[in-house]
Swiss-Prot record:
This is 3-isopropylmalate dehydratase small subunit. Its EC number is 4.2.1.33. Pathway: Amino-acid biosynthesis; L-leucine biosynthesis; L-leucine from 3-methyl-2-oxobutanoate: step 2/4. The keyword Chloroplast does not apply. Heterodimer of LeuC and LeuD. It comes from the Bacteria. It comes from Aquifex aeolicus (strain VF5). One of its GO terms (molecular function) is 3-isopropylmalate dehydratase activity. One of its GO terms (biological process) is L-leucine biosynthetic process. It catalyses: (2R,3S)-3-isopropylmalate = (2S)-2-isopropylmalate. Belongs to the LeuD family. LeuD type 2 subfamily. The keyword Cell division does not apply. Catalyzes the isomerization between 2-isopropylmalate and 3-isopropylmalate, via the formation of 2-isopropylmaleate.
Amino acid sequence: MQMKFRGRVWKFGDNVDTDQIIPARYLNTSDPYELAKHVMEDSEHPEFAKEHKEGDIIVAGKNFGSGSSREHAPIAIKYSGVPVVIAKSFARIFFRNAINIGLPIVEAPEAVDEIEHGDEIEVDLEKGVIKNLRTGKEYQATKFPKELQDILKAGGLMAYAKEKLASK
């Protein structure tokens, strides 16, 4: 998995929960591409699933991914083509589920405060840097420990475990 991304921002507020990310009415499927068709459907941007482009980046406030422990939520985001989610903070279970399935997530409160809907940004996960291309300003994000970077580079926890087992 690449560790640098560039995309247009979709800005969301605080407390975006898993029901907003992927509504419960779609939990009868485990097809990630079907889930992606409905991502963010019950959020403040219900048009997101139909109007976002592959590579667009979600930027949100605090407590992103709160609510029920639903692995469908990060899966829907990942398979919709969103390469990274930036937020002030993440619900802990969402954080872990995202890492496990290989969806990069970044905590950067200052960046969230200043980046606007529609801005184009660059994200470098290895350096922990976010750059707003509209303003030229760079923000330091909370950098992942090497172990989490390795899991993300592998594409998720299962892929990482397979790599580790194969190398023994």
